[in-house]
Amino acid sequence: MKHLRLALAILVVAMLGGRPALAHPHFQKTIVVKLPAGAEVTLTYNTTPANEMRAAEVKVGSFVTPRRPLVKLSSELKAGALTIAAGEYTLGVIKNGDNDWTMALYPGAIERNATPDPAKVIKLDSTYSSAQGKAEHMLIDITPGAGRFEGKAVLTLHFGTMFLAAALS
């Protein structure tokens, strides 16, 4: 009986100790989209929990990038009034206020804990909403646009209740 209790205790500890690792995986995601104009856009990112408490701590004017998602453009691309050169960019957001964010790109891949040069940040013509529901983990995609982005390819970033969209064509 003593051995059975010990075996059961070890099993319970092992199950409880292993549960967080099983309950919370992160996925490497890659999305490739060929836009009607011919450019290929590749999004590469790791899912991360939508921690809005950390987002609330971001200083106004700061560029932040949860897990440093990458956007690769095969050719030059129009994004609103901007022309963005072919290449690799880190996707992020700029905090404008408590409930106001702008989607942005930063040339190249940003190393972990590096401070991006604010002068190099490319602000995209984007919309922000907190009324699109909640994403428990960060979701990034390219979808057909609606509303003011009707008829355009739209880069979207959904993080908790924060939803940003920016036209890419």
What are these regions (language model features)?
Residues 11:
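Structured alpha-helical
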Residues 64-113:
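Mid-length scaffold segments of soluble, non-membrane domains
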Residues 14-21:
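C-terminal segment of classical bacterial N-terminal signal peptides
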Residues 1-8:
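Bacterial N-terminal signal peptides that target proteins for export
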Residues 22-64, 96, 108-169:
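Primarily secretory-pathway and cell-envelope proteins
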